[in-house]
């Protein structure tokens, strides 16, 4: 069935049906999203984040519920999605409706990119007059990044350094 095809695409994840009927997943027993209502959890997780400057960078994004919720709240915002594992990205595309995400005019999806390239993509996608790093809200949840700890650890360090440069240069 459908879950079997998803499991063959991304064998590390266990796909299951949430109580509300949506698809959710676990990675090594850790739920990526709510086992009851992933959409509601995602909506609450992004509500009120950086409303004056709708710019966000997601380090990992699970199945995409948070990205979809954020893009519905900020349809003219800038969103950078970072995922080092292409299989996770394609599994997410198969599960969640990404229409609101792909409707964004300022969207960057960095899949399987070296960390240095991700930093450049974040910098180059900044809204003119806005600091690329210190002006953005970062979603960085261990359940979305645990599958690639080394990659995201390096990215966190370099992004923090660039955010500090943003603040100094302002």
Segment roles from a protein language model:
Residues 1-170:
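N-terminal donor/sugar-recognition subdomains of glycan-related enzymes
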């Amino acid at each position: 069935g459908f879950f079997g095809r998803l499991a063959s695409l991304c064998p590390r994840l266990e796909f299951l049906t949430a109580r509300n009927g949506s698809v959710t997943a676990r990675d090594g027993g850790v739920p990526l999203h709510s086992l009851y209502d992933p959409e509601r959890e995602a909506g609450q997780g992004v509500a009120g984040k950086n409303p004056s400057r709708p710019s966000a960078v997601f380090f990992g994004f699970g199945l995409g519920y948070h990205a979809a919720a954020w893009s519905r709240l900020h349809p003219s915002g800038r969103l950078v999605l970072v995922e080092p594992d292409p299989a996770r990205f394609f599994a997410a595309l198969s599960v969640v409706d990404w229409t609101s995400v792909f409707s964004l005019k300022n969207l960057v999806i960095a899949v399987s990119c070296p960390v240095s390239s991700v930093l450049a993509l974040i910098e180059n996608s900044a809204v003119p007059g806005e600091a690329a790093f210190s002006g953005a809200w970062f979603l960085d949840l261990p359940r979305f990044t645990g599958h690639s700890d080394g990659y995201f650890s390096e990215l966190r360090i370099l992004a923090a350094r660039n955010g500090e440069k943003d603040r100094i240069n302002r």
